[in-house]
Regions:
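Glycine-rich, flexible loop/turn motifs
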Residues: 26, 110, 118, 154, ...
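Short, glycine/charged-enriched secondary-structure capping and boundary segments
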Residues: 112-113, 119, 162-163, 177-180
Length: 183
């Protein structure tokens, strides 16, 4: 079972608050920069503390909380309008695709103590594709080369090579794994 981390947001240190303010400023600058400009590339690396792989890009606008908890592999594309709530960490492996307006949410509020956030990692595995407008919730892994259909709400793990759709997302078919070559 995945360990849950709990954070009381009323007890943030001054350093944590300063880091949050820095991230907000960097993301604002990123969202105002011309895509693919030198500033845009520099800010992208700075936002993710260099944990973004070769030939990867995150398109603006981006909304992110604790982006230093996000790791992005090589050859990843994250399209416009992505929300990354990453207190529980978000990992996006090589060759993954995140379509427009996807929400990657690794934290939630405790239903009885709302000043406490509960955190579990989100993992998007190699070659996975998360369709437009989908939400991936805390503790979920989207498997290798899996597809999440547009508008889905993913509350449980999606197995490797599965196609899952709906709210909540359910597996509707399987991809032929022999059609995928690891690069």
């Amino acid at each position: 079972m995945m360990k849950e981390v709990r954070i009381d947001v009323t007890k943030q240190t001054s350093e944590e608050l300063e880091l949050a303010a820095l991230h907000a400023r960097l993301i604002h600058q990123f969202n105002q920069s011309a895509p693919f400009s030198d500033d845009w590339w520099r800010l992208q690396k700075e936002i993710f503390k260099g944990k973004i792989g070769e030939n990867s890009r995150v398109m603006s606008p981006l909304t992110a909380v604790r982006p230093h908890e996000v790791t992005i592999g090589n050859n990843v594309v994250v399209m416009n309008g992505c929300l990354m709530m990453s207190a529980g960490t978000i990992t996006i492996d090589d060759d993954a695709r995140i379509a427009a307006n996807v929400q990657l949410i690794s934290n939630n509020h405790d239903p009885y103590h709302r000043e406490v956030i509960t955190c579990k990692p989100v993992h998007i595995c190699k070659g996975a594709w998360v369709g437009a407008g989908s939400s991936v919730l805390p503790g979920v892994t989207v498997g290798r080369y899996a597809i999440v259909g547009a508008g889905s709400v993913v509350t449980k793990d999606v197995p490797d090579y599965a196609v899952a759709v709906g709210n909540p997302a359910k597996v509707i078919k399987w991809l032929d794994k022999t059609k995928f070559e690891d690069k």
